[in-house]
A protein has these predicted regions:
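Non-catalytic all-alpha helical scaffold/repeat segments
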Residues: 1-121
Length: 121
């Protein structure tokens, strides 16, 4: 069953991580949301759809720039970081007020790309 559809992702109701992310988004305090989002961002085996949803929810529901940056950097450093999550981040860089935060995200994405193993031909 599809619960949300947009140009970036289709979120499926039976993905427990997406349901968990939605529950976290309803927490009252920013610090609580940050800690819970960060636990998910570091989780192994996080689906592509859940990663994209996490990016959207963290950027929409965290007030502090440092908290947003912390979640995205944690996800980028996750070995399972997906290209769809990367695209979602890049499309939403305007959610950051400070150029230094935008540059930090871009820098870490670039470092990840340069360290990624190349395919054997």
């Amino acid at each position: 069953m599809i619960i949300a559809e947009d140009e970036e992702a289709i979120c499926v109701a039976d993905d427990p991580a997406i349901v968990e992310i939605d529950a976290i988004s309803k927490l009252s305090f920013d610090a609580d949301r940050q800690h819970a989002y960060k636990r998910i961002a570091a989780r192994e085996g996080l689906s592509e759809a859940a990663q994209v949803h996490l990016v959207k929810e963290a950027l929409d529901n965290l007030s502090f720039e440092a908290a947003k940056e912390d979640i995205l950097l944690t996800l980028i450093r996750n070995p399972g970081f997906s290209s769809a999550a990367e695209s979602a981040m890049l499309k939403r860089l305007d959610k950051f007020s400070f150029e230094s935060s935008k540059n930090k995200i871009l820098e870490v994405i670039n470092q990840r790309r340069t360290q990624a193993p190349t395919a054997v031909k």
